Regions:
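Active-site neighborhood for divalent-cation/phosphate handling
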Residues: 20-142
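Residues that cap or initiate secondary-structure elements
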Residues: 28, 65, 167, 209-211
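Glycine-rich phosphate-binding loop of actin/hexokinase-like ATP-binding domains
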Residues: 77-84, 169-177
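Accessory, usually C-terminal, subdomains that scaffold auxiliary metal cofactors
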Residues: 97, 109, 170, 174-219
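Short hydrophobic alpha-helical module
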Residues: 123-127, 164-167, 190-193
């Protein structure tokens, strides 16, 4: 049995309307294998990494339908109203909620974005739970060693962004960004408005970046 088939590995998958990306992780967090770029939906049944079994699977869906609310302010039964205040909801959109204890908040969200790929992948991975990408961005902030922490993703013309200083969350939002240049604009605009020193900050992207995008980001 090869190392990347062992049951103690985990897989992390990001899904959008246009496709998906993945990383296979060893128990120590080291990347065993990963997609070099965004993959089309038609490759789901032929990608070897998606045909294997893992000790754990994480599936993140790119959905702009979310609201982060302080736990004390979100009363039972008010989840849909809280989400409708910040995004457009169709009558049939399912609204869910999960805890974000590290920031004393609850994340209200909807996975109803007109795709079925996340469900197909989840079923192939023993019904793994699908959570919004912003939930994983918020969790990833703790992995950034610098005091100024910035974690982002860019897919399907949208930037997802979370920023914190130490243990204090400053921003969790998404922005329309049809290209990476626009994504950078919103990223650096947020940094400027929050009065964060970009030279003393770390920017982590969860979505794959091409060489040109990496050069542009860190120039």
């Amino acid at each position: 049995m090869s190392p990347d088939i062992q049951s103690n590995n985990r897989i992390s998958i990001q899904v959008s309307l246009s496709g998906y990306s993945f990383k296979v992780l060893a128990p120590d967090g080291a990347v065993v294998s990963a997609s070099a770029s965004w993959l089309g939906p038609g490759t789901v049944f032929t990608t070897p990494e998606l045909q294997r079994r893992y000790v754990g699977a994480e599936i993140a869906l790119m959905t702009p339908k979310f609201a982060l609310v302080p736990s004390a302010f979100l009363l039972p039964g008010e989840e849909r109203e809280a989400l409708a205040d910040v995004c457009d909801l169709a009558p049939g959109d399912e609204v869910r909620v999960c805890d974000v204890p590290q920031f004393g908040a609850r994340l209200v969200y909807s996975l109803s974005v007109g795709e079925t790929l996340s469900k197909v992948i989840a079923q192939s991975l023993s019904a793994a739970e699908v959570l919004p990408e912003i939930w994983y961005l918020l969790r990833a902030l703790a992995d950034v060693p610098e005091y100024n922490r910035i974690v982002a993703s860019h897919a399907d013309g949208r930037l997802y962004l979370a920023i914190a200083q130490g243990k204090t969350l400053l921003l969790a939002n998404s922005y329309p960004a049809p290209d990476f240049t626009t994504a950078e604009y919103y990223l650096f605009l947020a940094v400027k408005r929050l009065q964060i020193n970009p030279e003393a900050s770390a920017v982590w992207f969860r979505t794959p970046l091409g060489p040109a995008e990496e050069r542009s980001l860190y120039r």
